[in-house]
Amino acid sequence: MDVKQYLTEWSECYRKDFVENIMPFWMEHGLDRKHGGVYTCLDRDGTLMDTTKSVWFQGRFGFIAAYAYNNIEQNPEWLVASKSCIDFIEAHCFDTDGHMFFEVMEDGTPLRKRRYVFSEGFAAIAMSEYSIASGDKTYAQKALDLFNRIMYMLNTPGFLAPKYLDTMKSQGHSITMILVNTAARIRAAIDAPVLTEQIDRSIKALRENFMSCE
């Protein structure tokens, strides 16, 4: 089997699984049609095990549904699901300081807040992808505004609680990597110098700090 045939067969396999298994499962069992957004703790049979909602997953599913609409199949239900997650995020998942919660109750009541900005990153790419899918450019601007907010939080001493004390300086791989993806996905919807600049900075940091010369 040549490489092209190999990739084609696996691509078709993944597409079939996504369209016929993964999305139907989450649309039927995960989508919260009362409060909005999506439940995140489901058993294999779809049984709801916990009604609390991970905020980062609201953005992730909002992105996945919109990306699937843009690249796999223009299923209107997927677009509605994406918008539901974004609406839930905007209505319930931002604290008064602009930093997002990490976990909320099913109705959006705040439950837990952490020092990360991963919730913001997923929310931003959901908004940018939904902008492309729906044609509503206001969501592209919202994504860019949120990205700028992420950068403010990361670069403002004391805004986010540090993981370690200043005893030893360190740099995390996760945020360096995630900023590349976040900026790239937003850039697909709206171009801004700050996005390309961050991608370049992250790639430079990855090469200098996280890659072995081997």
Regions inferred by a protein language model and the residue ranges of each:
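Glycan-recognition and catalytic cores of secretory/periplasmic carbohydrate-active enzymes
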Residues: 1-214
